[in-house]
């Protein structure tokens, strides 16, 4: 697999343990419509926005307060030609000590490259979920995940309200 991908780097005043706990609380920052387990090696979960995006993801590496790595096992998008663009990509959350005692979170979706038809939408979406929702969960205790009943229009409007 290529090491190319999309990345987001953020710094926090919170401890590595607090950042880690927020990362594995996927329902707290990505979607409340996640089924399955999201905290330990070999856990699998499903992310679903009906008729738009469906992913089955396995945790392949989990080191508390240091990293979480997901492997996308299956993926379908309704809005691109190659619906399986994410399949076999890797999503990494790497936590480390930064300057002045701050905690650094480096998110990388390895394999999500500009050549993918979904790249612009996916890059923007990760910017919202990791750059805004996960950040809010880490700093305030409350993220901005998709609600179980949200459709794509509601999700898009929420992203635009934060970006705009």
Where are these regions (language model features)?
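Beta-strand/loop substructures that line and gate deep hydrophobic ligand-binding cavities in soluble
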Residues: 79-128, 145-147
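Hydrophobic ligand-binding cavity/cleft-lining segments
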Residues: 1-38, 163-164
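Glycine-rich portal/gate segments that line the openings of hydrophobic small-molecule binding cavities
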Residues: 28-82, 163
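Short, intrinsically disordered, mixed-charge
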Residues: 21-29, 64, 128-132, 136-140
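Hydrophobic/aromatic beta-strand elements that line small-molecule binding cavities or substrate pockets
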Residues: 9-10, 55-61, 88-97
């Amino acid at each position: 697999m290529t090491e190319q991908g999309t990345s987001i780097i953020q710094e926090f005043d919170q401890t590595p343990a607090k950042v880690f706990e927020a990362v594995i609380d996927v329902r707290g920052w990505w979607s409340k419509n996640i089924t399955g387990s999201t905290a330990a090696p070999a856990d699998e979960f499903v992310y679903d926005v009906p008729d738009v995006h469906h992913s089955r993801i396995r945790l392949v590496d989990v080191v508390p307060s240091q990293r979480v790595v997901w492997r996308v096992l299956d993926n379908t998008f309704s809005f691109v030609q190659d619906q399986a663009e994410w399949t076999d990509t890797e999503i990494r959350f790497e936590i480390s000590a930064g300057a002045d005692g701050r905690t650094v979170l480096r998110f990388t979706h390895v394999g999500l490259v500009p050549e993918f038809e979904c790249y612009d939408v996916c890059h923007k979406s990760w910017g919202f979920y990791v750059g805004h929702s996960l950040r809010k969960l880490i700093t305030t205790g409350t993220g901005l995940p998709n609600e179980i009943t949200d459709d794509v229009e509601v999700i898009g409007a929420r992203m635009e309200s934060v970006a705009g």
